[in-house]
C-alpha cells in the first residue's frame, strides 16, 4: 500500500523528535540561553533592568513551590559591583547562600542597568548538595528583589517558570542543527 506523502508529513509532524528541547527563555525582563559542551553547562543570562542594590536569580528544582530549589544569584551593589552566589531554598521565603559559589563566571558586562553574564557549572552533581542538572527539571527566573547590607531581601513581582528543562539535550551539535534549519 502506498501512503500519500501529505499523510506521511502530517504523521511526522506529531512525532516528537529526540533533539527537541527548550534551550532558551525570554520575556520583557530577562532572557537566557544554555548549552552543554562535554559535561559542562554554560548559561548566558541577561537582565534588562538590574538597578543598584538589587538581585536576580535562576532557580532549579521541582519544589514543591519555591522550596528545595538550587539557585544562582546575581547581585549589583551600590558601587556597581556584580557578585554571583549559589544557594538553596530549604523553605519558602528563605535562601541560604553557599560559603563558596560552585559556578564559574566567564563573562560579565554591565551597561547602564543591562546585565549580561555567562556562568558555567558541571552538568552533573555540583556544590555542597551535589545538585545535578543532567535530568529534566524546572527552571525558575526570579527577576529580583532588594539587596540590603549584603542580604537578599524577598523578591518582588512575578516569577517565571520554564517547565521540564532538559539541559543535557542542549548541545553544540543540536544548536548548530537549529541554526542551520533557520537559515534554509
From Swiss-Prot:
Keywords: Glycoprotein, Secreted, Signal. It comes from Caenorhabditis briggsae. This is DOMON domain-containing protein CBG21755. InterPro entries: DOMON_domain (IPR005018). Glycans are attached at residue 49. It comes from the Eukaryota. Residues 1-20 form the signal peptide. The lineage of its organism: Eukaryota, Metazoa, Ecdysozoa, Nematoda, Chromadorea. SMART domains: DoH (SM00664).
